[in-house]
Design a protein with these regions (language model features):
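A beta-strand signature from Gram-negative outer-membrane beta-barrel systems
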Residues: 160-205
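Transmembrane beta-barrel wall of Gram-negative outer-membrane proteins
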Residues: 201, 208-239, 244-282, 333-337, ...
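Short, acidic, small-residue-rich periplasmic hinge/interaction motif at the N-terminus
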Residues: 7-8, 34-41, 50-96, 134
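Acidic/polar loop-and-plug regions of large Gram-negative outer-membrane beta-barrel proteins
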Residues: 259, 267-334, 361-419
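Short acidic/polar hinge/loop motifs at secondary-structure boundaries
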Residues: 23-25, 126, 145-173, 192
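Extracytoplasmic beta-strand/coil segments of soluble accessory domains associated
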Residues: 104-145, 161, 167
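Short, small-residue-biased leader/transition segments that mark boundaries at the very start
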Residues: 3-11
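Short, acidic Ser/Thr/Gly-rich low-complexity loop/linker segments typical of extracellular
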Residues: 10-21
């Protein structure tokens, strides 16, 4: 292995050959040498002899902080070395800048990335990368693809709690070599979570923000024991009223990682995380024209008219309602194994399962005619940028009680209806990648990506 060698507290002055051999001329009989190698702890050695000195074999200890299994499995690109347009966000940056924003919004300052909250509800953010929608962006957590196997995209509300367990987040913009069969024409996003690298300790925190935003979080980690075991636990709850009118939300998130460093060549880890949540929404189909937004100023008082939700109202029992509503829970469990075969070759394998259960509601509008069974494309809140005023109270809220009364009085079934789209799926996958080096400039990758 090539080590970096320097005088203590000085710039590097020598690099060893591939076998670790080096010759160094010193101007003083006393010196402190410092040895560095990626993935190992730095080591210092004092030299006080004159003449030629053979230091023998110098052994470096593994450093769990920089040689985590998920980093190798996820294939993080190296700045100024990997030939791709890449941006890496450290956990300190995420913690400092994220605040009460949605997780994808942390990428707003990344070149070529456009992030928006869409309707403005919890977890409804979306990302475009170099003009491509999420269906053409590969999103991975610890190297495991998260994109839906049918339509290619993903819903960030299912992973809203990832911001609390992210060790680093990296975006690669544009086409590039990929180890997974996920759509990545626009680029890829790789999220690496906490693992064996965590220091021993824990914390409890509470945060609050505008519009009833609350977040309670706890985290504890054992650090790596002398036997090579490490355990990290995290749990939390986020709830609030939402910035947009009628977008209340409540979400839990949990994370568990159990890791074992068997020896210098083998390491295994088990990871489980999820974020069960529900949130009311403002449909992106309820957007108004500029004239329409100005017309709702009277409904919002001193608040911005753009916070108005055309389908916000109250049910027959006084409960808050919105035509669009989402509830979902999609936990993921994975078992990772990292095998460092030799100095040039490695094999990383991940087996995973993800189980999704939930649904979403949406308003479907009027029937076509008295004898029809289908509903025309007229949404509850608005139609073609114009606010629906047929079922509107004087304060601007949507009159759900009038719809209940109308449907109850109808002799031909419900005149206005809401649909519930149910999504239940079980994902199973196996991802294995073999890597080896041929000389200093050629890397070979091969493997399998199985998903069912």
């Amino acid at each position: 292995r090539r080590y970096t060698l320097s005088l203590h507290d000085a710039l590097p002055i020598s690099v060893t050959d591939i076998d670790g051999n080096f010759v160094l001329k010193l101007t003083s009989s006393k010196a402190t040498l410092e040895f560095k190698y990626l993935g190992y702890q730095d080591k210092t050695m004092k030299v006080t002899q004159k003449g030629n000195v053979d230091l023998g074999t110098i052994a470096l200890s593994l450093d769990a902080k920089t040689l985590g299994d998920v980093v190798i499995t996820s294939s993080i690109a190296v700045a100024r070395k990997t030939p791709v347009a890449v941006t890496t966000l450290a956990p300190e940056f995420i913690e400092e800048k994220l605040g009460t924003q949605e997780f994808p919004e942390i990428l707003k300052s990344t070149p070529g990335v456009y992030a928006t909250k869409q309707g403005g509800a919890y977890g409804d953010s979306k990302i475009n990368m170099r003009g491509f929608k999420s269906e053409n962006i590969a999103v991975m957590v610890n190297g495991i693809p998260m994109n839906d196997m049918e339509w290619g995209g993903l819903y960030w509300s299912n992973w809203a709690g990832l911001s609390d367990v992210t060790r680093s987040m990296q975006t690669q913009r544009g086409l590039g070599a990929s180890k997974v069969s996920a759509p990545s024409v626009g680029g890829s996003i790789n999220i690496v979570t906490r693992t064996i690298d965590q220091k021993k300790g824990g914390s409890i925190s509470y945060a609050m923000g505008n519009d009833g935003y609350n977040k309670l979080l706890f985290h504890v980690s054992t650090g790596m024991s002398k036997d090579g075991w490490a355990l990290t636990l995290l749990g939390g709850k986020t709830w609030g009223d939402g910035y947009i009118q009628g977008t209340e939300f409540s979400a839990y998130n949990y994370f568990v990682n159990i890791a074992k460093r068997i020896n210098d060549a083998h390491q295994i880890s088990f990871t489980a995380f999820g974020s069960p949540q529900w949130h009311n929404q403002r449909s992106n189909k309820d957007g108004l024209s500029i004239k329409g937004w100005q017309a709702v100023k009277n409904y919002m008082g001193d608040k911005s008219p753009y916070r108005y939700n055309p389908t916000y109202g109250f049910g027959p029992n006084g409960e808050r309602m919105s035509a669009s509503h989402n509830e979902y829970h999609k936990p993921q469990l994975s078992l990772n194994h990292q095998w460092q075969i030799n100095e040039k070759s490695s094999l990383s394998t991940a087996a995973y399962v993800s189980i999704g259960r939930g649904y979403g509601n949406a308003g479907q509008g009027y029937k076509k005619d008295a004898n029809g069974t289908t509903y025309r494309n007229m949404w509850y809140g608005s139609y073609k940028g114009n606010l629906n005023t047929y079922f509107r109270n004087s304060d601007g809220t949507f009159a759900y009680d009038q719809i209940y009364d109308m449907n109850e009085a109808s002799d031909n079934g419900s005149m206005m209806a809401m649909s519930k789209s149910i999504n239940e799926h079980n994902w199973y996958g196996l991802l294995s990648t073999y890597t080896t080096k041929f000389g200093d400039y050629i890397d070979f990758y091969g493997g399998i990506d199985f998903r069912y």
